[in-house]
Swiss-Prot record:
It holds the Pfam family Ribosomal_L10. Gene3D superfamilies: 3.30.70.1730, 3.90.105.20, 6.10.140.760. It comes from Picrophilus torridus (strain ATCC 700027 / DSM 9790 / JCM 10055 / NBRC 100828 / KAW 2/3). Forms part of the ribosomal stalk, playing a central role in the interaction of the ribosome with GTP-bound translation factors. The keyword Coiled coil does not apply. Residues 287-301 have a biased composition (Basic and acidic residues). Keywords: Ribonucleoprotein, Ribosomal protein, RNA-binding, rRNA-binding. The gene is rpl10. GO terms for biological process: cytoplasmic translation; ribosomal large subunit assembly. The keyword RNA-binding applies. Part of the 50S ribosomal subunit. Forms part of the ribosomal stalk which helps the ribosome interact with GTP-bound translation factors. Forms a heptameric L10(L12)2(L12)2(L12)2 complex, where L10 forms an elongated spine to which the L12 dimers bind in a sequential fashion. This is Large ribosomal subunit protein uL10. InterPro entries: Ribosomal_protein_uL10 (IPR050323), Ribosomal_uL10 (IPR001790), Ribosomal_uL10-like_insert (IPR040637), Ribosomal_uL10-like_insert_sf (IPR043164), Ribosomal_uL10-like_sf (IPR043141), Ribosomal_uL10_arc (IPR022909). One of its GO terms (molecular function) is structural constituent of ribosome.
Amino acid sequence: MTEPAQWKIDFVKNLENEINSRKVAAIVSIKGLRNNEFQKIRNSIRDKARIKVSRARLLRLAIENTGKNNIVKLKDYAHGQVALITTDESPKKIYDILEKSKTKAPAKGGEIAEEDIVIEPKETNFPPGPKISEFQKAGLPAAIEKGKIVIKSEVTFVKKGDVITREKALVLKDLEIYPITAGLDLIAAYEDGLIFNKDVLSISDEKIMSDLASAFLGAKSLAIEANFIVPEIVPDMISKAYLEAQSLAIEANFVDEKNIDIFIRKAFINASAIEALINKDLNNEDITDKKEEKAEEKETSSDEDAASGLGALFG
């Protein structure tokens, strides 16, 4: 069996020391990241974390050799083009730092569109020339207006999930449209025996606090309903018992100095309701009387008209 090269042995040992020297070890994807972009990110987080690019197989071997509790599960995420990050910051904080460091970059061709790439109608800075045929060949409704190449109408240039061809990548660069998110993509992180994947780390602080508050209120409500006494619900239980006692006293017409104002308000409300009913009945009687008076007046008027007619007939 061939012995591994000494540089590989030394490199793996160096990775082991890195992992053991910090509380947190994370695996990040560097796929598609240009060297200048990588160096810029490395410099921006230098005071918080260290980054080492490694072959995935060597990184998996180093993770196995560290002996940290449960860290061996982290090697399942070491595939493809990856790097190791070690830090004393929390996994969530280092994830947020990496997300904020991401920038938009031009497509080179061959990338998958992260979302629909829509080009709006616009005037470009290009004069008439070979560019117009390049734009048209790539699928843009290009024309010449006032000595400039213009895009005549909105077009979905590349649909989400489609491959950005080299031809279209060049057009996008000409139009200064940068559709690629460039940065280190944190895949998973280890801390104190736990593995945190991207799905967990991507949850916002606001979402975490909202979920905790909802869970607390739900548990509190359940404890109150079940009469399960814990310190957090004692004030609520006292308030609930007081309100139930007040309600029972009112139903039983039991008056004391604590609830007499409730009985007074109740009596006032009842009196107001009775007064309203009486006024309604009186109004109804007035309306009936007026209708009867009008009917009598109408009958009298009819009788007088009839008598007048007969008088005129018989002279």
